[in-house]
């Protein structure tokens, strides 16, 4: 029996895969629980159309991410914080402060996609990575200075 999986099934396949299973497994478990549908010609046609539309959407999202990456390419940030006499920062500089500085420049970036590798606890120059898409990321240099 050929079926189309509606979600990932362990040891069988991933969502939208067309797989062959024993009739009892398909009729008594996969189809009643909503994990699969019978792979009729019309269902296969609908699946192909859905995958085509999804690919088009993903391509558009990637193009938008690449356009934003091009805008962020030349950006350099300066973050002013309170500093002790030894040059250490009170607290630390993280993705929240970088997102705020980018917002001041007109780039609304979610703080969750900004990655700072090491804890920034001293004055100096550092780099942050903005992961706009799984295939598109931008490295933004930033400098921490005394307020």
From Swiss-Prot:
GO biological process: translation
InterPro entries: Ribosomal_bL9, Ribosomal_bL9/RNase_H1_N, Ribosomal_bL9_bac/chp, Ribosomal_bL9_C, Ribosomal_bL9_C_sf, Ribosomal_bL9_N, Ribosomal_bL9_N_sf
PROSITE patterns assigned to the protein according to its UniProt record, in alphabetical order: RIBOSOMAL_L9 (PS00651)
GO molecular function annotations of the record: rRNA binding; structural constituent of ribosome
Disulfide bonds: none
Keyword Ribosomal protein set for record: yes
A Pfam short name: Ribosomal_L9_C
Organism domain of life: Bacteria
Protein keywords: Ribonucleoprotein, Ribosomal protein, RNA-binding, rRNA-binding
Similarity remark: Belongs to the bacterial ribosomal protein bL9 family.
Its biological purpose: Binds to the 23S rRNA.
The name this protein goes by in its record: Large ribosomal subunit protein bL9
């Amino acid at each position: 029996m050929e079926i189309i999986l509606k979600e990932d099934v362990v040891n069988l396949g991933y969502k939208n895969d067309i797989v062959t299973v024993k009739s009892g497994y398909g009729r008594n478990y996969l189809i009643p629980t909503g994990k699969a549908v019978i792979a009729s010609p019309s269902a296969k046609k609908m699946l192909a159309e859905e995958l085509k539309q999804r690919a088009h959407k993903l391509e558009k999202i990637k193009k938008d991410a690449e356009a934003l990456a091009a805008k962020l390419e030349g950006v350099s940030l300066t973050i002013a914080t309170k500093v002790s006499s030894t040059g250490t920062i009170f607290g630390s500089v993280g993705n929240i402060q970088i997102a705020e500085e980018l917002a001041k420049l007109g780039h609304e970036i979610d703080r969750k996609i900004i990655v700072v590798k090491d804890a920034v606890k001293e004055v100096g120059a550092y780099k942050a990575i903005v992961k706009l898409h799984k295939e598109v990321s931008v490295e933004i240099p930033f400098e921490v200075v005394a307020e």
